[in-house]
From Swiss-Prot:
HAMAP family: Ac_CoA_synth. The keyword Glycosyltransferase does not apply. Mg(2+) binds at residues 537, 539, 542. It comes from Yersinia pestis. CoA binds at residues 191-194, 311, 335, 523, 584. Its EC number is 6.2.1.1. Catalyzes the conversion of acetate into acetyl-CoA (AcCoA), an essential intermediate at the junction of anabolic and catabolic pathways. Acs undergoes a two-step reaction. In the first half reaction, Acs combines acetate with ATP to form acetyl-adenylate (AcAMP) intermediate. In the second half reaction, it can then transfer the acetyl group from AcAMP to the sulfhydryl group of CoA, forming the product AcCoA. One of its GO terms (biological process) is acetyl-CoA biosynthetic process. This is Acetyl-coenzyme A synthetase. Acetylated. Deacetylation by the SIR2-homolog deacetylase activates the enzyme. GO terms for molecular function: acetate-CoA ligase activity; AMP binding; ATP binding; metal ion binding. GO terms for cellular component: cytosol.
Length: 652
């Protein structure tokens, strides 16, 4: 294929890199051959109150799945992210906050953050929150969201952060499932110039009669627009901290005490409350952050993720703060008020490391050079991609345009359930190939298996499994260990099943091919939708594409492609033929789309993932039950797609 673009390690990166190719080989071998020795040493990246003696105690055996790391050690996460830095870098910036409005920004030092966290931890105690209680956090992207999370960790409460874009029903469901005792929210959030009615959504959610555990709602004042107020239940953040002491000793926590619950949608049923514990998670978040981003003291790091997603937990807050880093928190979106906003923020704050998602990259790519207009971006040293496989064209555009053809891209594959990076390049140790997540991180043992669980050696394609545990691994699903075993360990016995497919090339590099339910079987041949989408998006007139399979009476499945064109382009019969021939040329006749569906927008969740389940149903005409659409950023897109489908004259 024309899309395999190799990029060597730049000399400027190699010179100062924390991990070289030789070090990677050495550490990786040690980490899989002697995990106790390797992780016993690496566990020291954080401070322990009582040091651990036992490192790894894990089992993936059917019916006995149990994951424990550093289980006899004790620590406090907030002390690791704050207190231990005060002597050396108390006056250093911990968080740079950039508002939705380009004229609003501020910095918070480690000393200030420590003070605010201690105060708010005492507020939580005064409201009756105890060690082990669950606190729901439904906040905008403001430093107070970090304060709330760290304050929970300081006193041993378990936080359940709910993304600010979720509906009242979704909020209610998460509060009920987790038995949350308290809700922390804001009057409103601000995103792309629009107000998000957070408090109103909480009020609506709390009308659910099944919610009996909530005593108080703490409200942070972001805009000053809180309409409804329930005396006795609702309390202002600013009123509470006025009275609060800034002296709050950190609670001593066992390594296996729960740190947070984070809900993630399953392919079936209600969202799953993924549980991460304190010790192994923090060791893994800190170690992966340090080495994957090749973090050097003083680097300014920007992860564009919201705190409501696992990326926001591990790589906006906990990983960076545990390492004493400077982390940038952005309230806005990459293309507001202008399409060059992301580039402007990079220049304004002299960002050295940028971590964002393919969805954002593709949206900017559709704007062409306008996305970098009037900016230099010459402070950038490392860039990263997260959330879904990045197609080689978007990778190259990101590399050449945003990164001025000099920044290695760490294309990271991982999941809510893995806690941290699993397969990823290391800037000073890995030659890059556009579109490949490359190699496993230390201690991660991936394998490819066929549908019967037989290992596929060498160059192969198959289901991506992990054969042994790692410290950042989720321990269970909240209140449902049976579902945890069923979801992740029953498909392939004795292995963690990721739900993703991958192929391994001749260099041992992994290429994620998409969810396994996004695999097409055309005339007995397996085709990953990501591969076809990649070819489509490589066409100069196409901005975005999503591919699904529809039943075909001869081939088994036909290929149905939803396509969004770049601004200014119009669909024509000529373009229809041209696009089909283009894919035929890029991948081969088998991959030629049978049906093209032109559309202005695709149904996406608020985190930017394309909702393929809905696209499959629309494509097959099965619209009787589209399932839960509450997580869609814009539900009206579905109606539009249905209308388009009805009016389509598809060539047979």
């Amino acid at each position: 294929m024309s899309q395999i673009h190799k990029h060597p390690i730049p000399a400027a990166i190699a010179e100062h890199a924390l991990i070289t190719p030789e070090k990677y080989q050495h550490y990786y071998q040690q980490s899989v051959q002697n995990p106790d020795e390797f992780w016993g040493e690496q566990g020291k990246i954080i401070d322990w109150i009582k040091p651990y003696k036992t490192v790894k105690n894990t089992s993936f055996d059917p019916g006995h799945v149990s994951i424990r790391w550093f289980e006899d050690g004790t620590l406090n996460l907030a002390a690791n992210c704050l207190d231990r830095h005060l002597a050396e870098r108390g006056d250093q910036t911990a968080i740079i906050w950039e508002g939705d409005d380009p004229n609003q920004s501020k910095t918070v030092t480690y000393k200030q953050l420590h003070h605010d966290v201690c105060q708010f931890a005492n507020v939580l105690k005064s409201l009756g929150v105890k060690k082990g209680d669950v606190v729901a956090i439904y906040m905008p992207m403001v430093p107070e969201a970090a304060v709330a999370m760290l304050a929970c960790a300081r006193i041993g409460a378990v936080h359940s952060v709910i993304f600010g874009g979720f509906s009242p029903d979704a909020v209610a469901g998460r509060i009920i499932d987790s038995h949350s005792k308290l809700v922390i929210t804001a009057d409103e959030g601000i995103r792309a110039g629009r107000a998000i009615p957070l408090k109103k959504n909480v009020d609506e959610a709390l009308k659910n009669p099944a919610i009996t555990s909530i005593k108080n709602v703490v409200v942070f004042q972001r805009t000053g627009n809180a309409s409804y107020w329930e005396d006795g239940r609702d309390v202002w953040w600013h009123d509470l901290i006025k009275e609060a002491s800034a002296d709050c000793p950190p609670e001593e926590m066992n390594a296996e005490d729960p740190l947070f619950i984070l809900y993630t949608s399953g392919s079936t049923g209600k969202p799953k409350g993924v549980v991460h514990t304190t010790g192994g998670y923090l060791v893994y978040a800190a170690l992966t952050f340090k080495y994957v981003f090749d973090y050097h003291p003083g680097d300014i790091y920007w992860c564009t993720a919201d705190v409501g997603w696992v990326t926001g937990h591990s790589y906006l807050l906990y990983g960076p703060l545990a390492c004493g880093a400077i982390t940038l928190m952005f309230e806005g979106v990459p293309n507001y008020p202008g399409v060059n906003r992301l580039s402007q923020v990079v220049d304004k704050h002299k960002v050295n490391i940028l971590y964002t998602a393919p969805t954002a990259i593709r949206a900017l790519m559709a704007e062409g050079d306008k996305a970098i207009e009037g900016t230099k971006r010459d402070s950038l040293r490392i860039m990263g991609s997260v959330g879904e496989p990045i197609n080689p064209e978007a990778w190259e555009w990101y590399y050449n345009k945003i990164g001025n053809s000099k920044c290695p891209i760490v294309d990271t594959w991982w999941q809510t359930e893995t806690g941290g990076f699993m397969i990823t390049p290391l800037p000073g140790a890995t030659e890059l190939k556009a579109g490949s997540a490359t190699r496993p991180f230390f201690g991660v043992q991936p394998a490819l298996v066929d549908n019967l669980g037989n290992p596929q050696e060498g160059v192969a394609e198959g289901n991506l499994v992990i054969t042994d545990s790692w410290p950042g691994q989720a321990r269970t699903l909240f209140g449902d260990h049976e579902r945890f075993e069923q979801t992740y360990f029953s498909t392939f016995k004795g292995m963690y099943f990721s739900g993703d497919g991958a192929r391994r090339d001749e260099d041992g590099y992994y290429w994620i091919t998409g969810r396994v339910d996004d695999v097409l079987n055309v005339s007995g041949h397996r085709l990953g939708t990501a591969e076809i989408e990649s070819a489509l998006v490589a066409h100069p007139k196409i901005a975005e594409a999503a591919v699904v399979g529809v039943p075909h009476n001869i081939k088994g499945q036909a290929i149905y492609a939803y396509i969004t064109l770049n601004h200014g382009e119009e669909p024509t019969p000529e373009l229809y033929t041209e696009v089909r021939n283009w894919v035929r040329k890029e991948i081969g006749p088998l991959a030629t789309p049978d049906i093209l569906h032109w559309t202005d927008s695709l149904p996406k969740t608020r985190s930017g993932k394309i909702m393929r389940r809905i696209l499959r149903k629309i494509a097959t005409g099965d619209t009787s039950n589209l399932g839960d659409t509450s997580t869609l950023a814009d539900p009206s897109v579905v109606e539009k797609l249905l209308e388009e489908k009805q009016s389509m004259q598809t060539p047979s």
